[in-house]
Amino acid sequence: RDLRMSRGLGDVYKRQWQRTERRKALSQIITGTGDDTISNILKEIQKDFSGKEYSLTFLAEKFTSFCKPDMTSGERLAALVKAAVELTTQETPDWEFIAARLLNFRLTKKLTEQAEAAGIFSFYDKLRYLTDEGLYGNYILASYTPQEIETAAGFMCPERDKLFNYSGLDLLAKRYLIRTRSHEPIESVQEMYLGIALHLAMPEKQNRLQWVKKFYDILSRLEVTMATPTLANARKPYHQLSSCFIDTVPDSLEGIYRSLDNFAMVSKFGGGMGMYFGKVRAAGGNIRGFKGVAGGVIRWMKLVNDTAVAVDQLGMRQGAVAVYLDVWHKDLPEFLQLRTNNGDDRMKAHDIFPAVCYPDLFWRMAKRDLNQQWHLFCPNEIMTVKGYCLEDYYGEEWEQRYMDCVNDSRLSKRSMSIKDIVRLILRSAVETGTPFTFNRDTVNRANPNAHRGIIYCSNLCTEIAQNMSSIETVSTEICTEDGDTVVVKTIRPGDFVVCNLASLSLGHLPLEDEKQMKEKVATLVRALDNVIELNFYPIPFAQITNHRYRSIGLGASGYHHALAVRGIRWESEEHLSFMDKVFERINYAAIAASSELAKEKGAYHYFEGSDWQTGAYFIKRGYNSPEWKALAVKVSTQGMRNAYLLAIAPTSSTSIIAGTTAGTDPVMKRFFLEEKKGAMLPRVAPALSDKTYWIYKSAYLTDQTWSIRAAGIRQLHIDQAQSLNLYITNEFTLRQVLNLYLLCLLYTSPSPRDMRRSR
């Protein structure tokens, strides 16, 4: 009994000592910052992070070591945040959330000071101030009454600030929140999300405030992430909201320079670009009958490269462009060495991303015998001699015409063994990460709008696959207008691809709840469709194409996050089975939502004759359950609002904001430190704990065949494409890398029904 009493007294003294230490640490931090108002945040942290490894004593000790006598109050708060960041480890990952709360306190303090100085006392006051300062587009106040804006202000939930980790909140604060002309923050995180929601809901004629709330909720709960341009530019005067643009470069001097101008304008307003150079004549080709005088594609690569450097994306990042060339183009060998470190530097372009378009025939021949000859042609010469453009075909018809060209002695050929071409491709890929791969036959077979054109290439991140055609000048006339002489050009706009992206954060969503998923997908589809109406287009050709097709790119992030929190290992059949169901459910919900929007607002211009209208889309993918058959009938009668729906982008920066894993990739590491402008930032796998630690496996340690198999399963449910990264180590041989490329073709070429049977 005496022993029990002694132990009981010991526990009492221990708890008393712990309380004393907590009060001491609390007092030490408050004194160190010189700010009594921080006490509430610190007490919340003590309550929400009760583990002894998150004791404020550790924070106080680290903070004290950073403090210097001559620090300002702002510098002391920054030191406190830094202390929490540096306490973050894979054993104590929640310090990153504590750091985020302290960072948010610091941000809120600055915002309060800014608001008081500007006489801002309500959300409407803030919007009026931002509009008057030219930081907000005047269309928000023109579209909503003061009463509506104050009602919308009631939707804001500051508690959702706690969802952020430090990396996400820090990135959001530095790159996405609106700042004053003196670079001070003037907008909170929740105000940013509400401002975006107000903008996205503007086209709604009925229940508009309800849609504002729905858009705000899915954004602020981090259930979805909009593309970087939408996050950065929605609600602003220049509201360019689209990420991806693709141009078909014609084989003419005027056309090439027009494409360069298009790229410059897209980059100026924050868009990334894909450029198809497969129509441009090769080096040594003829020009106006003069033999051997064409400079080829590589000379133009230098201009594209310099444009990317000269015209950055609103000062936020360097211009970004992927340049595509067909694997049968005569300039391919030089093209494959654009970014390598050896060779003539005058033939290099280190700031662009080369990409190659492959027909199935190339990979089949590579699999059968690497010593076979592959023949390269000049596209202009084929057009001149044969009367057709080889790049305008795919599948069996392309193969027949390719062999026709091979056997035509009138055509000059550049012949190489497939082994030599593959060696160039893989060496460049291992050294530089490029060229990107675009399997054109697979893409065109799955194109639901093949009745209106062909897909030559993809965008910067290889997830967009839509009909393409060149912009052409029809005529140039000299006219008189109001007494002045003017030059009038008539231009055929072609199909200048533009796509509006957003991603479902799978790690934050109730994937098993079919009803909730349908509602959230439908909300996001509506938001993306509204982007088409609201967008500020950098060039008119993009606006024309976007309104014809109304294409969107609904994708996914947090893929590995979603698997880990469910205890599903990447290298498992359970992974494939689970994600097969998830993406089928997402696809069903997206198609149903687009069809309902078509009923409400009208179908896209080219719906008639599409695979959507004929039902071929559903038959090709083996969607034959009663639910799918009923949806196919509904789509055929109601129409589709959007020609293209699903596309999976890599989502690197927006995934950081949402505190989840990037795209559909495995995590790089469970924990690592990343250097950013002299600071070391912790990167922690989402929801890292004893339960998820062994579920997360580094991308470089993962068997890449599982990633390829998973991509094949997902592709059944995606009408466009997906960005797939392969993580290759120095231990890989070139043969092993080639086998992965061949495996990609195996898991995407068969019909979906064959895929399901053989999985």
Question: Predicted segments — roles?
Answer:
Residues 178, 196-208, 216-242, 246-289, ...:
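Function-dense linear segments that define catalytic or interfacial modules
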Residues 260, 520-543, 551, 569-651, ...:
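Internal maturation/activation junctions in enzymes
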